[in-house]
Each structure stands twice: as C-alpha cells, then as structure tokens.
C-alpha cells in the first residue's frame, strides 16, 4: 500500500494518467490525494472529475479556487471564465451528479496519525491545527447543507484580509475560503495579499510567502498544498510540500509518494500556451 499526493490537475487528464501508470497505482491498495483545482484551463476537466469520483474511497481531493468557481457557474451565479475549458461538464449526462459530488468535498484533510494536513493554498499564519479544522468545517457545512448559493455568490472579495476570531457571518466564511483556496503572499502583519503571483525572488520586499511567517504549526505538521505554480523549483522549508508545478502552464505535473518522499514528474503532453 502506498500514499500518493498530486498537484493541481486543471483538466490535465492525460498527464495524470501517465503518472498513475508510472507508479502502478492500484486503487484496491493505494490512496491518491489531490490538492484541488481538478478543473479549469486544461481540455479534459470532465475526465478529471469523473476519474477522481470513480476512485471512491481510494482518492480524496480538497476544493480549490477553480473548483469553487465551477460550483458558482453551475448554479448560475457566475459565468465561465474565458480561459476555462469546462463546457463539456455542463453538457455531460452526469453533470448534476458530478456537481453534487464536488460540492461535498472538503477544504482540508488532516491525518493525525501520519502528521500531515492537505489544503489547496495553505493554512493561515494565525491558525493552529484545531482552528484550521474548525474553520474548514464551518465552510463545508454551508456548502453541503446550508445556503451554498448565497455563500458562492458572496465569496468573490479580498476582504477581510486579516484573521480575527471575532469575525462573523459571510466575512468570516470569505476569509476562510480565501486562506484555503487563494492565499500566496502575506504582509508581515499576516494580512493576505492577492495581487502578487510572481516567483518569490521577484516579489515586493514587504511580502513574504505565507509559509515563511512565524506559526508553530508550520514546524509541527507536514503541510501539502498546490495552487502556486510559480513556486516551481523554489526551495520551501522542512514540512512544507508545494506540489503545483504548472502542468497547464506547459511545465509538468508532480506526484509525491509519501512513504519514501519520492517525487514523480510528467511533463505537459501538449501545448497549453493558449492559456497564457
């Protein structure tokens, strides 16, 4: 039995299949964890959704920002982004089933026994693991059982950008979503920045990657995340595993076997340059 983590798919189905073949993934014994953004700019988002869903308990994803946007478009709240290639999903006979399944995926997966946690973008510098779990559950409860359309319609904002336990209502939920699905850089006072997407060495001096801020959690638990393609080949601290290596940006898809920390890579199999 082996445990595998894989970076953002973004509709790059063929590359995922190559990786699964390379490691001889066996769904009867192995486990596959995905850091979110199953869909968007690649041309096989439908196939990615179907595959992960079909693996049942052998696979577990978390929600990424593109997954949440797909939910918002599915419920008529937002329009499909011009660069996203998700039309096949909306015309699929299993559309409603796929959207229902996606809406019931978590924002965070924590394995206390193996001491790792997985989210799409990261964990707030102001949270411990208990707070992170509780915050994830707050949003998940609304998405799965509450007024999810209202939440999806109100999540598109960058405020508030600083955590407070006193946050309530939609502002609290929005901050939680932004941390788990959009966060990259922060200011040193822990405020979130959503404008800078550049490589770390080209970022403004006042910004720092969230994982370089002071939070005891970052040294206590292994954190696996994706979302940040421009981090590719950038060294990260011990316990921090960044798996988005920009396959849809003509780079590569990365898979990590947890037991021996061996990486497997699959270069992009086609030119996705139209997404630039």
Swiss-Prot record:
Q: What is its EC number?
A: 3.6.1.41
Which GO molecular-function terms appear in the entry? bis(5'-nucleosyl)-tetraphosphatase (symmetrical) activity
Per UniProt, the enzyme's principal EC class comes to hydrolase
Name recorded for this polypeptide: Bis(5'-nucleosyl)-tetraphosphatase, symmetrical
| InterPro entries linked to this entry | ApaH, Calcineurin-like_PHP_ApaH, Metallo-depent_PP-like
Q: Does the keyword Transmembrane apply?
A: no
Q: Which organism is it from?
A: Mannheimia succiniciproducens (strain KCTC 0769BP / MBEL55E)
The record's family statement is: Belongs to the Ap4A hydrolase family.
Question: What exactly does this protein do?
Answer: Hydrolyzes diadenosine 5',5'''-P1,P4-tetraphosphate to yield ADP.
Query: What UniProt keywords are attached to this protein's entry?
Result: Hydrolase
Give the PANTHER family listed for this entry: CYTOCHROME C5, PTHR40942
- Reaction equations catalysed: P(1),P(4)-bis(5'-adenosyl) tetraphosphate + H2O = 2 ADP + 2 H(+)
Question: Domain of life here?
Answer: Bacteria
Q: Which CDD domains match?
A: MPP_ApaH (cd07422)
Keyword check for Hydrolase: yes
